[in-house]
């Protein structure tokens, strides 16, 4: 009966079959699960202070705290930001 009454509900429940073994999260695609697993493994590590990040762009932003690089600036006041 549920299959005919609420087919979307059943389909959505059937799709959620990629579970994280480290926590209770469940994903609808293997790619989404792989991206999530990076939050546990933190593969991007800073060579200077050894702080770890899940995404490379987060590490790149962090490295600017060591280098002092400020690549972004305000068009109005010209103040620079990391």
UniProtKB/Swiss-Prot annotation:
Q: Which UniProt keywords apply?
A: DNA-binding, Metal-binding, Nucleus, Repeat, Zinc, Zinc-finger
Q: Is the keyword Zinc assigned to this protein?
A: yes
Q: Where are the zinc fingers (C2H2-type)?
A: 1-5, 18-40, 44-66, 72-82
Q: Which domain of life is it from?
A: Eukaryota
Entries under Pfam families matching the protein: zf-C2H2 (PF00096)
Question: What InterPro entries does the annotation carry?
Answer: Snail/Krueppel_Znf, Znf_C2H2_sf, Znf_C2H2_type
Can you say where in the cell this protein is located?
Nucleus
Give the record's GO CC terms: nucleus
- Which Gene Ontology terms cover its molecular function? DNA-binding transcription factor activity, RNA polymerase II-specific; RNA polymerase II cis-regulatory region sequence-specific DNA binding; zinc ion binding
Q: Which family does it belong to?
A: Belongs to the snail C2H2-type zinc-finger protein family.
The protein in question is named Escargot/snail protein homolog
Q: Which organism is it from?
A: Bradysia coprophila
């Amino acid at each position: 009966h549920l299959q005919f009454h609420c087919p979307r509900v059943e389909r959505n429940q059937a799709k959620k079959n990629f579970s994280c073994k480290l926590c209770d999260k469940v994903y609808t695609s293997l790619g989404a699960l792989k991206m999530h697993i990076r939050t546990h493994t933190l593969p991007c590590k800073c060579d200077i202070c050894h702080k770890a990040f899940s995404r490379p762009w987060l590490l790149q932003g962090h490295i600017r705290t060591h280098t002092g690089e400020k690549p972004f600036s305000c068009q109005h006041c010209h103040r620079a930001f990391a």
